[in-house]
């Protein structure tokens, strides 16, 4: 049995958790989040300086809260983990410095965790977790990627967005429609009242230099522009903007693109399991469509529990436990943070000479 205290401060969610691995299962002893969404909403997006300050204010209380909720103390903890990349540098530093300080104070190993690895491991918190090999659709505000996970939990990116992430597209379209931030929940709320067949928007593709298209990659900037032009056209005619129908049509085409390319890769490469993680994976339309289309190809779908799709510390703790179970060495206490760092480089976070 191993227990990890984990911290997540990569963007605008301050989070702490205590996660245990016992008899082959991951168990969340306590999980606490302080969201800054309302504070950033008035700016239409995350303000890095505000995010860092709120992490500083919230984290001590969150750590105290998870120990109080769980009924354990530091003597029961085997390691301390924190997100170190990618994300907002100032925000990452708050969690990393806090974790390394606690590691020194309590003489516990420290593990620096890649944020995307945390998302990948969030599916392991479900009642029926997937077993590698499988394909992961990681779809969030900052990332839209297809990642193949092999039997020994090695990661290979096999598809990506070449411009906006899907979640970023949701935020931008919500803003131009005059809806609230974050855009994903706002658009989903209006889409439930609309007709997804009302407007036909393009499914962006990425061209190859030699001709043709990358079959498993994504592009959402053209879709965002198409929605903008449609809104401008409707306004020029003096008509009322049909928010529900626009939201439903946009949500539907994003879901179709994500589902079609994910299922195609899994089918083409003989993978029988497909996993969805990340904030956008909480979208009901996307979840239903993925299950339906994957079933047609005899592909099983696994999803992170909705509560763990958005940023949280439980997924970071789970990723740390996976590392510990596999025999990965702790990170150096000299490991810093990085705003950008590729997932396939994540093994470098555990070298005696850290990458940053």
UniProtKB/Swiss-Prot annotation:
**In the record, what terms sit under GO molecular function?**
iron ion binding; N(6)-L-threonylcarbamoyladenine synthase activity
Q: Does the keyword Acyltransferase apply?
A: yes
Q: Cofactor(s) for this protein?
A: Fe(2+)
A single Gene Ontology biological process assigned to it is: tRNA threonylcarbamoyladenosine modification
The free-text cofactor remark is: Binds 1 Fe(2+) ion per subunit.
Which amino acid positions bind Fe cation, per UniProt? 115, 119, 311
Where is this chain's protein located in or outside the cell? Cytoplasm
EC number(s) given by UniProt:
2.3.1.234
Chief subcellular site?
Answer: cytoplasm
Query: What's a Pfam family this protein contains?
Result: TsaD
NCBIfam families referenced in this protein's UniProt entry, alphabetically: gcp_kae1, T6A_TsaD_YgjD
Role according to the record? Required for the formation of a threonylcarbamoyl group on adenosine at position 37 (t(6)A37) in tRNAs that read codons beginning with adenine. Is involved in the transfer of the threonylcarbamoyl moiety of threonylcarbamoyl-AMP (TC-AMP) to the N6 group of A37, together with TsaE and TsaB. TsaD likely plays a direct catalytic role in this reaction.
Of which family is this protein a member? Belongs to the KAE1 / TsaD family.
Descriptive protein name: tRNA N6-adenosine threonylcarbamoyltransferase
Q: Which organism does this sequence originate in? A: Prochlorococcus marinus (strain SARG / CCMP1375 / SS120)
The primary gene name is tsaD
């Amino acid at each position: 049995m191993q227990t990890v205290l984990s911290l997540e401060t990569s963007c605008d969610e301050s989070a702490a958790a205590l996660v245990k691995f016992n008899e082959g299962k991951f168990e969340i002893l306590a999980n606490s989040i302080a969201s800054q969404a309302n504070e950033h909403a008035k700016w239409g997006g995350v303000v890095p300086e505000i995010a860092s300050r709120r992490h500083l204010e919230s984290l001590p209380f969150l750590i105290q809260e998870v120990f109080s909720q769980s009924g354990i103390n530091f003597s029961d903890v085997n390691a301390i983990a924190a997100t170190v990349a990618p994300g907002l540098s100032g925000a990452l530093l708050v969690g990393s410095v806090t974790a390394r300080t606690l590691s020194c104070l309590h003489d516990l190993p420290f593990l620096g965790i890649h944020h995307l690895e945390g998302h990948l491991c969030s599916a392991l918190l479900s009642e029926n977790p997937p077993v590698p090999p499988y394909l992961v659709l990681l779809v969030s505000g900052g990332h839209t990627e297809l990642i193949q996970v092999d039997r020994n939990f090695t990661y290979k990116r096999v598809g990506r967005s070449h411009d906006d992430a899907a979640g970023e597209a949701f935020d931008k379209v919500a803003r131009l429609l005059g809806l609230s931030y974050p855009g994903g929940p706002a658009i989903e709320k209006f889409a439930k009242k609309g007709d997804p067949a009302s407007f036909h928007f393009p499914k962006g593709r990425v061209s190859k230099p030699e001709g043709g298209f990358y079959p498993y990659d994504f592009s959402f900037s053209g879709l965002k522009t198409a929605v903008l032009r449609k809104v401008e056209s409707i306004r020029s005619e003096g008509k009322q903007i049909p928010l529900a129908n626009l939201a439903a049509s946009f949500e539907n085409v994003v879901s179709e693109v994500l589902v079609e390319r994910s299922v195609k890769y899994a089918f083409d490469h003989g993978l029988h399991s497909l996993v969805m993680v990340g904030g956008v994976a909480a979208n009901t339309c996307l979840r239903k469509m993925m299950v339906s289309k994957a079933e047609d190809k005899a592909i099983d779908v696994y999803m992170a529990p909705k509560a763990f799709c958005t940023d949280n510390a439980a997924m970071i703790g789970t990723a740390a436990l996976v590392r510990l179970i596999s025999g990965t060495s702790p990170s150096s206490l000299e490991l810093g943070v990085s705003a950008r760092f590729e997932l396939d480089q994540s093994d470098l976070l555990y070298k005696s000479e850290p990458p940053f």
